[in-house]
Structure formats: C-alpha cells, structure tokens
Design a protein with these regions (language model features):
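Catalytic P-loop NTPase motifs of RecA-like helicase/translocase cores
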Residues: 11-21, 48-49, 162, 180, ...
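C-terminal helicase lobe
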Residues: 95-113, 122-152, 157, 163-244
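SF2 helicase catalytic motif II
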Residues: 1-38
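Short, conserved loop/helix-junction motifs that constitute active-site signature segments
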Residues: 1-2, 31-35, 92, 188, ...
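Structural recognition of the conserved hydrophobic beta-strand(s) that form the central parallel beta-sheet
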Residues: 4-7, 38-44, 152-155
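A short acidic, helix-capping loop that chelates divalent metal ions and anchors anionic groups
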Residues: 12-17, 71-75, 135-136, 209-213
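Interdomain hinge/linker at the junction between the two RecA-like core domains of SF2 helicases
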Residues: 30-33, 37-38, 45-93
C-alpha cells in the first residue's frame, strides 16, 4: 500500500481545466484508488487563488508558505526600448549563460538565427529550444548548456519546469509572459547557485496586445465553459439577474 504521495509543480493541479493538463483533474480518483495516502503538494509559483483551488482538488488541510526572497536577483526594466534587439545582442555578447524566452516556437528559431548573425563570435554557442524538438534533442541542448558548450538558449516556456541549471546569469523576457505563474517560472531559472544574476524585461506594450489577441483566439466558448462546470448555465445566472 502506498502511504505517501508527493505532487511536484502542483500549481498545475490548481490550474487544470478540460483540455489543458486535464489529467490533473483525475488526481482525486487516483488518490482514492491508492487508499487515500498522505499528500504533499509542492510548488514555487502558486498564487493565492491557485492554492485555494489545490486545497479544493486535493486532500490538503494545511499550507506552508516560504517567504524567501532571492536577493541575488536583479530586475532590469528595459521595456519599450527603441531597439530591444540591440540590447539583446549586448547581453548575449557577454558570453555569460543566458536564456531568452519568446512566445512561439517559430520565434525561438528565428531569433536564434538572428543572434548567430549579429553575434558571430558566439554563433556556435547559441541554440533554440522548444517543445517541438524531440526529447533526445532537447536533452542534448540541456547538456550542452550545462557543460558550457552553449552559452545562450532561445526558448519557449518549455525550458522551465524540471530544468535545474545553477549558473544562468541572464534571463531575458523578450516577449511578455502569459501570467504571473509563467513569469515566476521563467525568472526563477536565473541565479540558482546564489550568485548575482539579472532578469531583463525586454517586452513591449505591443506584446501585451499580441497576448490579448492570442488569448481571445484560444479562449473556449461559453458553452464549453458550461460543460466544464466553470460557469453556471444561463438559467442559474437568471436567478441572480432576472434580466437575463
């Protein structure tokens, strides 16, 4: 009999919806099938609403919040620069380990190619990384970055959870993250060895508009939300607002 279960990156269980990591929605049934073991859920990025949802979905009766502040991290705000690409080139040219986050696989490839041209001395040390790569290829990129063969990775959010490299000196948010949890996951890659590291904000107000359009495109229809029990049907709203 299994008596103790640990769920890492547990914020996903608090964010899970139909079609998006929906396997987490099966956790209550899985735990029941295991005989209701003691559960420890861990995460570094859960917001207060996510913690509340975790307590609802999982058999959690108490929470512990570590208020540790990583004082080795510096935040450099370069949003809305006239040329963020030039600023990015100057960061990559230092040769220090750098992760640049973008919002699409195509952008990861395109920006890596651009940087190889703009920073020729580092061209062979720049790679892209995204979930479209085979697992074996992603592993090779990770190992090359770990041993110093690569100094710069242009990546989607795929380079995040489960990747623990201690000596990343620069994390660049070239495009705007989609939320606080994603921001924390990306920023949290920097300076895990306790040494000074910099988080560079290079996104612009234009990125906010792009994100809004993307969210509008991918947002489920109201009928779908009703089937997922995320919003009540119109009949239920009518009890609150008789004009519906």
């Amino acid at each position: 009999r299994i008596g103790f279960v640990v769920i890492d990156e547990a914020h996903h269980a608090g964010l899970a919806k139909g079609g998006d990591r929906s396997a987490y929605l099966d956790m209550p049934d899985i735990l029941k099938a295991l005989g209701d073991p003691v559960v420890l859920a861990t995460t570094a990025t859960a917001t207060a609403p996510v913690v509340a949802e975790l307590a609802r979905v999982l058999p959690i009766t108490s929470t512990v919040v570590d208020e540790t502040v990583r004082e080795n991290l510096q935040l450099e705000d370069d949003r809305d620069l006239a040329s963020r690409e030039n600023r990015l080139v100057s960061i990559v040219a230092t040769g220090e380990k750098t992760v640049i986050y973008v919002n699409s696989r195509d952008q990861s490839v395109a920006l890596a190619k651009t940087l190889r041209k703009r920073v020729p001395d580092c061209a062979t040390h720049i790679a892209f990384y995204n979930a479209g790569l085979a697992r074996s290829d992603r592993r090779r990129v990770e190992e090359a970055f770990r041993d110093g063969s690569l100094s710069c990775i242009v990546s989607t959010s795929a380079f995040g959870e489960g990747v623990n490299l201690p000596d990343i000196r620069h994390v660049v948010l070239y495009h705007m993250p989609f939320g606080a949890i994603e921001f924390n996951q990306m920023s949290g890659r920097a300076g895990r060895d306790g040494q000074p590291a910099v988080i560079h904000l290079l996104y612009s107000s234009r990125d906010a508009r792009i994100n809004e359009r993307l969210l509008d495109c991918y947002a489920p229809e109201r009928d779908e939300l009703v089937t997922l029990n995320i919003v009540p049907p119109v009949s239920e709203w009518s009890k609150i607002n008789p004009n519906l």
